[in-house]
Amino acid sequence: MSLINKEILPFTAQAYDPKKDEFKEVTQEDFKGSWNVVCFYPADFSFVCPTELEDLQNQYAKLQELGVNVYSVSTDTHFVHKAWHDHSDAISKLEYSMIGDPSQTITRNFDVLDEETGLAQRGTFIIDPDGVVQAAEINADGIGRDASTLVNKIKAAQYVRQHPGEVCPAKWEEGSESLQPGLDLVGKI
């Protein structure tokens, strides 16, 4: 079932905040009022996952400039996130919150739970300031994501929100032309 244009469901979870080196509670209410990226991944202390999370960290400054909060989520606990952060070269670089979802509530809410393994699939969601999902990407377990494309998707989502009636075509980049759907464009693209 698609979550696009749907408000995220309620949840309460514990997260590890590497910036403050502390645990904190996170709820769906924390997503209101700003743009958010939620990056689900299968497991801590694994293989593709640290490469993805490090890549996301490499884009973190750009995401912060766009006013985007970043959260990673797995079905591990927040304690395991802290241990991973303390022992992995890649994960020790992270500045964004790592949400633990051992109850699988959030993973189920976003429909990325692999029922056979009990782990999260590789899902990335862009959530607007109203708590509504604007973009989703889910990859098979062996396929890592590229965070640089995520930055451009967020820019497009923000542009469309700020410019009602306009849409961003394929390969749209900030500063390039958008489209205004209407009868005058039918069959001309």
UniProtKB/Swiss-Prot annotation:
<dbReference type="GO" id="GO:0005829">
    <property type="term" value="C:cytosol"/>
</dbReference>
<dbReference type="InterPro" id="IPR000866">
    <property type="entry name" value="AhpC/TSA"/>
</dbReference>
<keyword id="KW-0049">Antioxidant</keyword>
<keyword id="KW-0963">Cytoplasm</keyword>
<dbReference type="InterPro" id="IPR024706">
    <property type="entry name" value="Peroxiredoxin_AhpC-typ"/>
</dbReference>
<comment type="subunit">
    <text>Homodimer; disulfide-linked, upon oxidation. 5 homodimers assemble to form a ring-like decamer.</text>
</comment>
<dbReference type="GO" id="GO:0102039">
    <property type="term" value="F:NADH-dependent peroxiredoxin activity"/>
</dbReference>
<dbReference type="Pfam" id="PF00578">
    <property type="entry name" value="AhpC-TSA"/>
</dbReference>
<comment type="similarity">
    <text>Belongs to the peroxiredoxin family. AhpC/Prx1 subfamily.</text>
</comment>
<dbReference type="GO" id="GO:0045454">
    <property type="term" value="P:cell redox homeostasis"/>
</dbReference>
<dbReference type="GO" id="GO:0006979">
    <property type="term" value="P:response to oxidative stress"/>
</dbReference>
<dbReference type="InterPro" id="IPR013766">
    <property type="entry name" value="Thioredoxin_domain"/>
</dbReference>
<keyword id="KW-0676">Redox-active center</keyword>
<comment type="function">
    <text>Thiol-specific peroxidase that catalyzes the reduction of hydrogen peroxide and organic hydroperoxides to water and alcohols, respectively. Plays a role in cell protection against oxidative stress by detoxifying peroxides.</text>
</comment>
<keyword id="KW-0575">Peroxidase</keyword>
<dbReference type="InterPro" id="IPR036249">
    <property type="entry name" value="Thioredoxin-like_sf"/>
</dbReference>
<keyword id="KW-1015">Disulfide bond</keyword>
<dbReference type="GO" id="GO:0033554">
    <property type="term" value="P:cellular response to stress"/>
</dbReference>
<protein>
    <recommendedName>
        <fullName>Alkyl hydroperoxide reductase C</fullName>
        <ecNumber>1.11.1.26</ecNumber>
    </recommendedName>
</protein>
<dbReference type="InterPro" id="IPR019479">
    <property type="entry name" value="Peroxiredoxin_C"/>
</dbReference>
<keyword id="KW-0560">Oxidoreductase</keyword>
<dbReference type="GO" id="GO:0042744">
    <property type="term" value="P:hydrogen peroxide catabolic process"/>
</dbReference>
<feature type="active site" description="Cysteine sulfenic acid (-SOH) intermediate">
    <location>
        <position position="49"/>
    </location>
</feature>
<feature type="domain" description="Thioredoxin">
    <location>
        <begin position="2"/>
        <end position="159"/>
    </location>
</feature>
<dbReference type="GO" id="GO:0008379">
    <property type="term" value="F:thioredoxin peroxidase activity"/>
</dbReference>
<dbReference type="Pfam" id="PF10417">
    <property type="entry name" value="1-cysPrx_C"/>
</dbReference>
<dbReference type="InterPro" id="IPR017559">
    <property type="entry name" value="AhpC"/>
</dbReference>
<dbReference type="InterPro" id="IPR050217">
    <property type="entry name" value="Peroxiredoxin"/>
</dbReference>
